Amino acid sequence: KSDGLPTGAVSGFCSMLFKLLEDARSDDSKNKPTHFAVIFDSARKNFRNEIYTDYKANRAEAPDDLAPQFEYIRKSVEAFNLPSVELLNYEADDLIATYAKKITEAGARVTVVSSDKDLMQLVSNKVRLFDPMKSKVIGEKEVIEKFGVKPDQVIDVQSLAGDSSDNIPGVPGIGVKTAAELINKYKTLENLLNKATEIPQNKRRETLLLNKDKAMISKQLVTLKNDVPL
């Protein structure tokens, strides 16, 4: 703008939203959207910081040219006449998980528009993701390609592998590939940890035994709450 206010993020957001709405109007498939909502994070800190104080502590503040645009992104949602939702002490992903549960229990399908891999745990025969940057639908097949396990096991893989971008510790030395191998064999994180003494590889066995608490804390951090009081 002429007054120096950056508008790149607002413009990009509005363009994406406009395209989604236009595509929805022309969609004649069984997945044609009937309801829209935009969900925001309400603050940097939430209940996960009470579980693990270093959660997302490595995240830098929003760049100076981005921070002032958040207000206008919210106003643009109003201009599109769409509802927006945010709730103190919860992340947007928790609200998405809660709405997805409520909607599917009511018998409808859900499309979550996001490229966030953390939402892949929600994928089911009634919930799919849509990555607007790649125009790609993400279902069970794509989740398996990404994590090596089915959607309902993604949480356990993330609990082991951790996530440096969110400062989630996981188990040191275990990445996504190894985590997927372990979860495919032992089915759940809890079963793996209970049977860790049976693991033949000495280093892996000792690492798991020494870091059980980190794995379980990580599970609390990566698990999206689907019972948020909306």
Model-derived regions, located:
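Noncatalytic, basic helical substrate-engagement surface that gates or grips nucleic-acid strands
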Residues: 1-113, 117-137, 214-217, 223-230
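Non-catalytic nucleic-acid-binding/docking modules located in mid-to-C-terminal regions
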Residues: 26-37, 80-82, 105, 124-126, ...
